[in-house]
Regions:
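C-terminal transmembrane helix and the adjacent membrane-cytosol boundary/short C-terminal tail
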Residues: 10-24, 28, 39, 95-172, ...
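Interhelical loop and adjacent transmembrane-helix boundary motif
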Residues: 68-120, 177-181, 223-235, 377, ...
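Transmembrane alpha-helix signature in integral membrane proteins
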Residues: 1, 208, 234-265
Length: 440
């Protein structure tokens, strides 16, 4: 839950940003308390994002093997570990493929029902599509009424608790109810941030310890482990450069394919649009172990195992959907009247795209590239199966060290990666926000 919570938050945020806050204010003017307006108005509107976040977490956790392998025991074996055991130890590719197909079938079945009820467009920050139109609501029937009854009940409970709190706790007359709500929101947000960030920052002090193994609290202060990372015999600098090179090329190819696809999906109406969108974002909803095993089969026939080209193509497959989703979210907020004005002044579509559209949304494009870069840089499953032992990326080297020899060198590498990735994320978020402000 700790590792996957950010993915859930980002998925819900994309939908919640499109909710009109005036609706809750209107409910307040009609006498509804904040609890009632949340459960009866805000939560139903944010349900596509909540469901999308839950499903993405479910699918991603199905493909998890790093955390169970490092922290779990024999009784905590996950299905991905079973697939890897059949391939690496038993060389039973047929049985591993059968398990992978069962896993893929389960995931596709779940997302089929999700698409029927809410629509896959919510994954790109859209609202409920045609899948949740009046026709679907009529099919839901009793289920919708039952759900509304639950939400109404939760709203009444929250309203009653709020009224009881007002009677028991005396408020400062100079402070409004919104001030207290804002304070509570900051407290909850602070707890979540501490939950997410605190375990990560435990790595930093450990990387400066004088001991030869991981201990807490760390003893002494030493830079020897950072010296080990940058020593001439260390594999980490070369692995870092290799990971950066692969991530750059993967991000480039993902942008080359993903940006035109995003424009087509947002601006064009054609038959089978939802099917094509589902196909393009399918790597997001498919556990990476299935993609890695499938690409291993394919690339082995094409003699691409153990080559940089094979690894770059594999990373492009998993990064392209994130580029499409990110660029689609930016294009949806773009004012097409700017393009139309350029057309009326005699500019062609290609010139308009190059001199008008791209400069305005370039922040979003750079952010999409950086997201693709981060995902590729941090990818382990593809590196395990597509490198063929010929070379190793930085995540693969860290994985081997975590399994074979855990020492403070790993903490030093993790600290450097934390600084590197944090810088990229902050820059990409800054560019995304600036792009949204320019579009708005």
């Amino acid at each position: 839950s700790h590792a996957l919570m950010p993915l859930c938050v980002l998925t819900m945020l994309a939908v919640m940003e499109n909710i009109d806050t005036n609706l809750a204010k209107a409910a307040g003017t009609l006498g509804a308390r904040r609890g009632q307006s949340f459960w009866r108005i805000y939560f139903p509107l944010s349900l596509p994002g909540v469901a999308a976040g839950g499903l993405l977490i479910f699918v991603t956790s199905l493909g998890f093997f790093i955390t169970p392998a490092l922290l779990g025991g024999a009784r905590d074996t996950m299905i991905v570990q079973l697939i890897m055991f059949q391939i690496d130890s038993m060389l039973n590719w047929g049985f591993a493929g059968a398990i992978s197909m069962l896993l893929l079938g389960t995931v596709l079945l779940i997302f089929f029902f999700y698409d029927r009820w809410l629509g896959l467009s919510t994954l790109s920050g859209g609202t409920q599509g045609k899948a949740t139109s009046s026709g679907t609501k009529r099919r839901v029937g009793l289920g919708a009424r039952f759900g509304n009854s639950i939400l109404n009940g939760l709203g009444e409970i929250c309203a009653g608790l709020g009224a009881l709190y007002d009677k028991l706790v005396k408020r400062d007359p100079a402070r409004s109810r919104a001030d207290y709500s804002r304070r509570s929101l900051w407290i909850v947000a602070g707890i979540v941030i501490v939950f997410l960030a605190a375990p990560t920052f435990f790595i930093i002090p450990v990387s400066f310890t004088e001991e030869g193994f991981l201990t807490w609290p760390p003893k002494g202060f030493s830079l020897q482990w950072y010296g080990t990372v940058f020593a001439d015999s260390s594999p980490y600098p070369a692995a870092f450069l290799r990971s950066v090179l692969v991530a750059l090329f993967a991000g480039f190819f993902a942008m080359l394919i993903g940006v035109p696809a995003a424009f087509m999906l947002v601006r064009k109406q054609f038959f089978g649009k939802s099917v094509i969108f589902a196909f393009l974002v399918s790597p997001i909803i498919t556990p990476h172990i299935i993609l890695a095993v499938s690409l291993f089969y394919l690339f082995a026939r094409l003699h691409l195992i153990g080559t940089y080209l094979g690894l770059i193509l594999g990373h492009t497959v998993i990064t392209m959907p994130y580029v499409i989703v990110t660029v689609m979210a930016v294009i949806k907020n773009y004012d097409v009247r700017l393009d139309q004005a350029a057309w009326t002044l005699g500019a062609g579509k290609l010139k308009t795209l190059w001199f008008i559209t791209f400069p305005i949304i370039k922040g979003g494009l750079i952010a999409a590239f950086m997201f693709a870069f981060i995902i590729s840089f941090d990818e382990l499953t593809m590196a395990i199966y597509l490198t063929g032992g010929e070379f190793a990326t930085l995540p693969k080297h860290m994985w081997v060290d975590a399994i074979m020899r855990v020492n403070p060198t790993l903490a030093a590498v993790a600290t450097l990666m934390l600084l590197f990735m944090t810088t990229i994320i902050l820059v990409s978020e800054f560019l995304r926000r600036r792009s949204v402000r320019r579009i708005g």
